[in-house]
Regions:
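Short flexible linkers and secondary-structure junctions
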Residues: 1-13, 148, 152, 193-196
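Periplasmic alpha-helical coiled-coil/stalk elements that build and connect Gram-negative outer-membrane
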Residues: 2-115, 230, 234, 276
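Outer-membrane beta-barrel pore domains and translocons
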Residues: 6, 17, 58, 143, ...
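Short segments within alpha-helical structural elements
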Residues: 16, 61-86, 245-303
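Sec/SRP-type N-terminal targeting helices
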Residues: 25-26, 50, 54, 124-128, ...
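Outer-membrane beta-barrel proteins
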Residues: 49, 159-163, 194
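Small/polar, glycine/serine/threonine/aspartate-rich low-complexity segments that form flexible
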Residues: 95-106, 138, 151-187
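Long hydrophobic segments that form regular secondary structure
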Residues: 129-132, 136
Length: 306
């Protein structure tokens, strides 16, 4: 079970870093284009040398962020390949899947818990152990009752004296044949309370197993509740991040127009660009967090993680 969760988490981490790399590459290209534009404006006296320096610094910062994003992607890919026990990560890549988020209503915790009771191996194993303890009690109680046993035996012997051949080997086996049959009735009147102690021990074991099962169920329910609330929070965060991206895209568009018309400084333009970049990164993080949280709920419902 842990392997499935770990692989899913590692896989989504790779996709997360893949998208961050694309955002970083896009922002780097945008910074380069803007830097070229400011240099041209400076050449005709419409931009200061300070703005040119700021633009070049912005390009350098974005290039560094791109390198870091690509390194994070490669490290995440390495972690996944090692988790899958691939001989080498060389040539190991992932195709970009369709990660469009469809907000289906989340299954209620109680319903997930009901499904989990029938498919979680830990719960099933605890239930089987508890059922087996009832048989152990009956076996221990059987010593309270009289026991009738049956036995049978058959045997023969052969002997010889030096120089005597009066009786052959075959005749001796036949003549000396002994047969026996018997019954034994055991009535447990007093056995130093051994039977009672064995029954008590079996009942105590049953009580302990029942407590273990109950505790396992409680832990499972708490885990499901926590997973459900985490999914709800992740959904809310993703919705908020999408709204933030929409707002920052519009803000950046307006700031770009103002900067092009000379009504905004490069610092103001760069701040709007940074806000947009951050909101895009937050959205990507929120998306994959939501996807992971919903996969956890599927895991508790016994669904294959796909």
């Amino acid at each position: 079970e842990d392997i499935a969760i770990n692989v899913t988490s590692s896989y989504l981490q790779v996709l997360f870093n893949m998208e961050l790399s694309k955002v970083a590459a896009s922002q780097t290209e945008l910074s380069k284009e803007q830097c070229k534009r400011i240099i041209r404006l400076a050449e005709v006296g419409k931009a200061s040398s300070a703005e040119v320096a700021e633009a070049k610094a912005r390009v350098a910062q974005d290039e560094m962020s791109l390198v870091q994003a690509e390194n994070n992607y490669q490290l995440a890919l390495l972690d996944l390949s090692q988790l899958l026990e691939l001989p080498t990560p060389e040539g190991f890549t992932l195709a970009q899947p369709d990660t469009v988020v469809n907000f289906a209503p989340l299954t209620a915790p109680d319903d997930i818990y009901t499904e989990a009771l029938s498919n979680k191996p830990g719960i099933r194993a605890a239930q089987f152990r508890l059922e087996g303890s009832e048989k152990s009690i009956r076996i221990a109680q059987s010593n309270y009752y009289p026991q009738l046993s049956f036995g049978a035996s058959i045997g023969t012997n052969f002997y010889t004296l030096n120089g005597s051949a009066e009786h052959s080997f075959g005749s001796q086996l036949k003549n000396n044949l002994n047969k026996g049959i018997g019954f034994n009735l055991s009535v447990p009147l007093f056995n130093r309370l051994a039977t009672r102690n064995r029954v008590r021990s079996a009942r105590l074991q049953q009580t302990n197993l029942a407590l273990q099962l109950n505790n396992t169920k409680k832990v499972l329910y708490k885990e499901i509740q926590q997973a459900w609330y985490n999914a709800v929070a992740a959904e809310s965060k993703f919705n908020s991040s999408m709204a933030a991206v929409t707002a920052n895209e519009e803000s950046f568009r307006l700031m770009s127009e103002k900067f092009d018309n000379g009504k905004a400084t490069f610092v103001e333009y760069n701040e709007a660009k940074q806000n947009l970049t951050k909101s895009l990164s937050d959205k990507i993080q929120a998306k994959y967090d939501y996807l992971f949280r919903t996969k956890i709920l599927d895991f508790y419902k016994g669904k294959a993680i796909e």
